[in-house]
């Protein structure tokens, strides 16, 4: 980067107006699943404008900016192409990618992380079934995962048989989900089965429809009866407290100060 700093510094000093100036150098390595480098890039930007990039076919830096900074991009490209040390390093870009990535490639790609699984009801779509389940699977690595559904232990087809690709979370883990449309019946058990290399055994998550209609009716009647009983009991206690206690009250001005004994 030192080789082209004078050019970028000159451009910065020649610009007017408020704000800062940023020179950005980006180098990337594209590797396949085995860790073999497939592509190498090296680009230079100024204030987010891409100026020049390494052209592997021409073995030189080529301008990428064709707007107001085109002249700068050409001058910068010509200047960098005269730097033999830089040119040699860029020609060996793919080889350097392999050298720099292999020491930690295994620790990053050979690791595994088991998935977290949860089954929940969701809004049905593209189906006449009244209920739809979603099996959420997240936080796993690598991306390959198998999701199947079972009803009372027997395999059933998901809502869509199309293969779904796991989506990256941005933290070296992935997420995906599977749907199942159904008409629930009392006593049925639906199970989402997730198989992944990070889990020693398949992960099972069950879902049941809940109470039967008769049970729901009985529970509702019992709840209403209990509520009415509590209301009646509360009203009785309030009425009793307001009425006070009935007892004998002697009249004032008794004519028999010593009392009267009747035998």
Swiss-Prot record:
List, alphabetically, the SMART domains matched.
IGc1, MHC_II_beta
Per UniProt, the keywords (alphabetical) are:
Adaptive immunity, Disulfide bond, Endosome, Glycoprotein, Immunity, Immunoglobulin domain, Lysosome, Membrane, MHC II, Signal, Transmembrane, Transmembrane helix
Stretches the record annotates as Beta-2: 113-207
Q: Which residues lie on this side of the membrane: Cytoplasmic?
A: 240-263
Look up keyword Heme and say if it applies. Answer: no
Region listing for Connecting peptide, in residue ranges: 208-218
Entry's InterPro entries? Ig-like_dom, Ig-like_dom_sf, Ig-like_fold, Ig/MHC_CS, Ig_C1-set, MHC/Immunoglobulin, MHC_I/II-like_Ag-recog, MHC_II_a/b_N
Q: What is the effect of changing residue 65 to R?
A: Decreases the interaction with MHCII and peptide exchange
Q: How the protein is affected by changing residue 28 to A?
A: In allele DMB*01:07
The record places domain Ig-like C1-type at 114-208
Glycosylation site list: 110
Highest taxon in the source lineage:
Eukaryota
| UniProt GO cellular component terms | intracellular membrane-bounded organelle; late endosome membrane; lysosomal membrane; MHC class II protein complex
User: Where does this polypeptide localize?
Assistant: Late endosome membrane; Lysosome membrane
Topology within the bilayer: Single-pass type I membrane protein
Region annotation (Beta-1) ranges: 19-112
Residue ranges, Lumenal compartment? 19-218
Annotated consequence of substituting residue 73 to V:
Decreases the interaction with MHCII and peptide exchange
What role does it play?
Plays a critical role in catalyzing the release of class II-associated invariant chain peptide (CLIP) from newly synthesized MHC class II molecules and freeing the peptide binding site for acquisition of antigenic peptides. In B-cells, the interaction between HLA-DM and MHC class II molecules is regulated by HLA-DO.
Q: How does it assemble?
A: Heterodimer of an alpha chain (DMA) and a beta chain (DMB). Interacts with MHCII; this interaction mediates rapid selection of high-affinity peptides in a pH-dependent manner, with an optimum at pH 5.5.
Show the domain comment: The YXXZ (Tyr-Xaa-Xaa-Zaa, where Zaa is a hydrophobic residue) motif mediates the targeting to the lysosomal compartments.
Question: Its family?
Answer: Belongs to the MHC class II family.
Name the record gives this protein: HLA class II histocompatibility antigen, DM beta chain
